[in-house]
Amino acid sequence: LEAELKLQQNVSMVEENHRLRTMLGAAENSPLTTSVAFVSNINQSQKKQHVVIDQGSADGLFIGQAVLNLDGVIGQVDVLGQHFAHVILITDTTHAIPIEVLRTGLRTIAYGAGTELALTEVPTSADLQVGDVLVTSGFGNRFPRGLKLATINSMAVSQDRTFQTAQAQPFAQLDRLTEVFLVWPDQPVTNNE
C-alpha cells in the first residue's frame, strides 16, 4: 500500500513538472510580460465563478489584471490581498469581455453565462456561425488583442428576427485550473478606468 501511494505521488509530480515546464517555456517565448501563479482555491457555482491564486499586491498584481492559461483567457483579478488574489472567471454571470470573431472581425461583448459565454443582441445581419473562434479584441486595454477565448457552439434568432444570440465554449477548462499566467500590459494600467 505504501509503495502504491508513493508511485501515485511520483506520477502526480511528473505530470505537474511537465505542466510547469510547458508553462515556463510558453512564458519565455511569449511577447507578453507574464508570470506564473498557482490556484489555491476554486469557487464555482451556477452564477459565481472565481478562483484564488497565490500571488497578490506584494507581487505587483493589480485589479483588472488579465489571467490566462495555456489554453486561453480565464478571467481577471477582481479582489486583491497582499499575498493572494481572487480571479473572476470569464463564465461568471457578472463578467463581460470585449471580443472579436476571428473569421470576420466582428466585435461585440461576450457575457459570462455560468459554464459558457453568451453573445446577446448581435444584429442578424452580422456574419456569425457555429464553430467561429472568439478572441480578445483589445478594447478596454485589459486583455491584449488576439488571445484565444472560446468557440461558438450554438446560435438562436430572436422572435422578431432583429437579433441573434450565441453560446460559446471557452477553450480553457475552467473547472481544472492548477496554474495560471498573469499578464502585465505594455503601459501601466490605473484602477480608475
Describe every region a protein language model picked out.
Residues 1-3:
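N-terminal leader/propeptide and maturation segments of large enzyme subunits in energy/redox metabolism
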